[in-house]
Structure formats: C-alpha cells, structure tokens
Amino acid sequence: GEKLTAGSKVYANNRNKMLVLVQVGKKDLSEGLNILGAHIDSPRLDLKPNPLYEDSGFAMLKTHYYGGIKKFQWVTMPLALHGVVAKKDGTVVKVAIGEEAGDPVFGISDILPHLAKDQRSKNINEAFTGEDLNITFGSTPAEAGSSEGEDKDLFKKNVLNILNEKYGITEEDFQSAEIEVVPAGAARDLGIDRSMVYAYGHDDRICAYTSVRAQLDLAGEVPEKTYVTLLVDKEEIGSVGATGMQSKFFENCMAEILGLTGGYDELKMRRMLSASKMLSSDVSAGFDPNYANVHEKNNAPYFHYGPVLHKYTGSGGKSGSNDATAEYIAELRKNFDENDVRYQMAELGKVDQGGGGTVAKFVSQREVD
C-alpha cells in the first residue's frame, strides 16, 4: 500500500466515537510522539433499551444516567434528544430533536413547592433518584380504533406514530438505539462583558476542540516529531470498552503507522511509546467565590491566569491518578515561559473534598510521560 512520509496526515475513526489524528514528523518514530489527548463524552442521560411507556395521560421515557451527574440539576430544564437508531436492515437513523428554533423540547418534572413537604425532609440523594429521571415525551392520545384493544396505550401510540412518520422507526428499534438526553440550546456568552461561555459539555469538549484546533493550525508544517491527537470516548465511566482509552485502538493505529513508514516491529513500538510525551487535557475546577470552602486558595486555579497544569489528579491520597514527573513538569514550564504562555499550577479542590481523574493514567501505562 501507499507509504507515509514526513508531512503525511492521516486519521483513524473508531466506531464514530474515538478519533486519532496523526501528522508524520521528520524524525524516526522510535524517537517518540508529541501527543494531545482529550475525551469527547460528557455526563448525560441515556434512554433505556425499553424506554417508552404511558402513565396517567402522559407518554414517558425512562433514562439511565451516564457519568457523574448531580441528578437535581436535570429536572425542570429544557432537554434535547441526540443519537442514532440502528435498524435491523443495517440502516442507521440520526436523531436530533430540541435544538432548532421550531423544535419541541423535553423535560423532567419536579414537585411544585406547595406539595414538597416530604421532599424537603429528604437529603438530596433521596429526593432525586436515578429512577425518577423520566422524560415527559407527549400528552396527546392517538385516535381510538373500533376493534377491541385499539383503545389501549393511546398516548404511547401517538408518539410512536410521530416517530415513525419522521424517522421511520418503531418501538422495537429503541432496543438498538443510542439516544442521549442533554440540555437543549446553543452555547451563549456569559456575563455582561461576554467574558465566559455558558454551554453544556465543557467537560471535555472545550479541550477536545482546542486540541484538534492546535493540530489543524499546524497542518501546513512538517514537524520534527510526529504529532498525534487522541479524542476518546467513555472517560466519564472509566475509559472502558472498545472506544475508551483502555482499549488497544491507539496502539493498533500506531502499529499501522509504523508499518506504513518503514515497517512494524514490537521493539520499535515500545521505544516509540517510551520516548513519547503527552498533554492530557481535561477541565479543572476554577475558584468559585460562591463555594470557596471546597478550594484551597493557594492551590486553586483562577480565571484570567491562563491554562491550568495539574501534576496529578485523583482523590484522597491521589488514588486513581497519574503523577507526572518533576522533570516533565519542568520541561513544560520551560516551554511555556520561553513562548510567553501564561499558565498556573493547581490542584482539583481541597484534599478529601472529592477529586477526579482523566485519561492520563491509562496513557502513562504505555510508559508515556
């Protein structure tokens, strides 16, 4: 097949959920890669395999939350549906409802304040449970038929008729669908000075976009070392599965690249990974004056002070963390300072307050800095 040379640009798509961009450099791959990495999944609600039911004059959808959500944040707000429905004939139908100006939106109801005495007596985890996050999908019945049984589940039938007319899908097709429920609406400027961005999915699409943008902006040059950008799925639930960072997709891609640039062998692959360096980018927790008690001020990131470097993340005693070496942090500091990049070193909140992790720990297992 066609060989890759310095300056060649290729990409690999893993099941439409993980992307690897590669720009081949001048140096031999055994001298290492310069890698950017971010995840493209975000906390959300997923429809269950059998989501649709009706109750008391409403057509409803059951959901199963994905990732670390605060359940109470998802009630009484406009929601949109995004995803795909894979049909038995092999076709895949894209679904997007709730983003266009004329689209309907969806929602999860809450108890009105007048009747919330019992709810107020519960702690927040008891007041809002995963099984309570049911989507109000419709409230108009279909016309009843004349035959026996045709007057049942009329609210459910009506929404199914609409879905079939618009998308050609049936109730059974939900079983092979991946439909996500997310906050409806486009990104907007936040603040009278328009200094911030109000949007769903900052975690981690803000880093995914900037990583891709960085590689595309350098597409016209031939780098010394090979550039790689990794956009991965399933970070919010542990980087698992065939499209998460724990999969073999990244290594498989680089094995193909080695094969197309002079020949694959296992030792060269190991040397390449060991000599590689990565910036694993994910969101941090900026200091919020409304919740100052969860931050330790000397080690909190602040607005206006540039991107944040975390030497480690994790929780408690750095559990579940990648702890970058002091030498690598020093190298990054030198590069940023020499290029007049403003940055800050920080931690993710107070010790024992919570914590978090990202894909770095899985990449570092390949002996990547």
Give residue ranges: language-model regions.
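N-terminal hydrophobic/helix-forming segments and targeting peptides
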Residues: 1-369
